[in-house]
């Protein structure tokens, strides 16, 4: 598969007057053309920071890239000129944000906001851009005449559809969806996911789906990467990772999913708390919460190694955890 995005040993820290938080610690990840990759992990794992790095949007001045690189079609996003970055954002790589209410400007109509993307990247006149915005609204299931409505006149699910229309306006090569259904109820979530699946085929875009919901990964993605404390701990095809989770953290995530069939049991949970990025433990960042960790785990983190045809894990004890 041809590489679209390549993340190489990427590390980021955030400095404040009080402390330093190590958000990403040697992330390695590849997104191929036509691939739908799920990035899953608890809140604070570094998922959104990884996505922002792809767009060279790490918040400044607190955020600092301390190592590694991110390549888009072979070129470092950190060596692109400001013009190249502006041309890439929204045109070649687009993002759907978690909360559609805060990602849309309340003082502009939805048509104007979608139209701005088209004016910038496709060089359309304002009138042409608004007309095209109306067509895009129809693609995501919103009546064309609502192009002149404001964000507050839409429901949460409709606002998220507007966000999807804006992201797809220029037919991007990569669509980043940062927990796009978190703020929506379950029935609307299903509609949005079904819409995204249809549009990914229609527009032939790659996808990075950021979520903590493993069900969404199973529904829409080909491959999945599991992130913990700013590192990738397991990666593989959805089929292999879901049928044979091998990192203790991944196994813990699957174990914490409520089961709808069989006898009622106490809901399992992962002991302890998420590693503090200001005081990361030595060795494997998960060893303090791991039931099979040894002295080796507290001293040296495992490198990623292959355990299946399309399955990789970073754990000295892979395969020793009871499922």
What are these regions (language model features)?
Residues 65-76:
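Conserved ABC transporter NBD signature motif
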Residues 75-76, 116, 127-145, 254-255:
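Conserved ABC ATPase "signature" region
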Residues 147, 237-323:
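Short catalytic/signature loops enriched in Gly
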Residues 149-154, 158:
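Conserved ABC ATPase signature
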Residues 169-173:
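A short, proline-enriched helix->beta-strand linker immediately N-terminal to the Walker B motif
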Residues 176, 180, 184-266:
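P-loop NTP-binding/switch modules centered on Walker-like glycine-rich loops
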């Amino acid at each position: 598969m041809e590489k679209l995005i390549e993340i190489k040993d990427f590390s980021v820290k955030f400095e404040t007057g009080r402390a330093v938080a190590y958000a990403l610690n040697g992330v390695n990840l590849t997104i191929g053309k036509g691939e739908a990759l799920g990035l899953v992990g608890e809140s604070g794992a570094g998922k959104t920071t990884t996505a922002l790095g792809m767009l060279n949007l790490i918040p400044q001045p607190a955020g600092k890239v301390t190592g590694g690189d991110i390549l888009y079609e072979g070129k470092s996003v950190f060596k692109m000129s400001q013009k190249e970055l502006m041309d890439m954002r929204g045109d070649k790589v687009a993002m759907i944000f978690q909360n559609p209410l805060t990602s849309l400007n309340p003082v502009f109509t939805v048509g104007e906001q979608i139209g701005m993307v088209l004016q910038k990247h496709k060089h359309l006149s304002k009138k042409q851009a608004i007309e095209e915005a109306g067509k895009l609204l129809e693609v995501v299931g919103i009546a064309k005449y609502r192009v002149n409505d404001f964000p507050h006149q839409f429901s949460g699910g409709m606002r998220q559809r507007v966000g999807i229309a804006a992201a797809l306006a220029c037919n991007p090569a990569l669509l980043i969806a940062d927990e796009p259904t978190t703020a929506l109820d379950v029935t609307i979530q299903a509609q949005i996911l079904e819409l995204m699946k249809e549009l990914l085929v229609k527009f032939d875009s790659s996808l990075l789906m950021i979520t903590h919901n493993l069900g969404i990964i199973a529904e829409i993605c080909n491959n999945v990467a599991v992130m913990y404390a700013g590192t990738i701990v397991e990666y593989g095809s959805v089929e292999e990772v879901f049928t044979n989770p091998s990192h203790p953290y991944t196994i813990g995530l699957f174990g914490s999913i409520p089961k709808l069939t069989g006898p009622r049991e106490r809901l399992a949970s992962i002991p302890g708390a998420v590693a503090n990025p200001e005081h990361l433990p030595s060795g494997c960042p998960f060893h303090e919460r791991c039931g099979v960790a040894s002295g080796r785990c507290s001293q040296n983190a495992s490198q990623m190694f292959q355990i299946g045809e399309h399955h990789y894990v970073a754990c000295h004890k892979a395969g020793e955890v009871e499922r």
